[in-house]
Amino acid sequence: MIDGVMVKPEVDQPENPLFTNGENHHMNACVGDNGGPYNLFDYGRGFFEGGHAAVKSAQDYIGPVDLLVYPAAFSYRHGIELYLKHLVFALNTILETGRSFEKNHKMIDLWKGVIDLHAAIGRELIERDAVARAGELIGYFDAFDPTGQVFRYPEDIKGNRHLAEHKLINVEVLRDQMAELREILERWVYQAADHRDWQLDQIKSQGAERA
């Protein structure tokens, strides 16, 4: 701000009238190397927050719930997918398999991968009832939208209308259960990170003993 007037911050980046900086500093998002590097977990957090924001907009009558249900549900689904991909990567790192996640949008396959990898570690990083509840919620979502397309387009690639058999979706009910799922998955991510740190400490100490 200069003499009470907000001005754009100087920034060295390619010119683009859409994706550029603005005078309101609080609304300038830090991206790329300026804000990260971000990982799948960070992106997932953003999509969960996006889902919550869409529901809040409906609650505040900023936008019609009949329209906001689509970006809300899509954001939640993508947030789940990104969290699961992050977990697959993290658990593979613990197991030192050298592998990562499949680059597709099959949420239930990602979940099965998480379960298998977690079992292979031989140590419970999160309580069993939490795993069961997460699996239940992911299963419900996958049964409703197995392809990740249901809330993106009104029809599938064959012209069949999505949601033809359904009449109502309460976005607050959806939000509350997505918040519950998010909490479980985030704890799992943090527990996996803590276990990896412990694992590296063990490797380091064993190396020191041999020396």
Model-derived features: positions:
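Domain-scale activation on soluble regions of proteins
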Residues: M1-A211
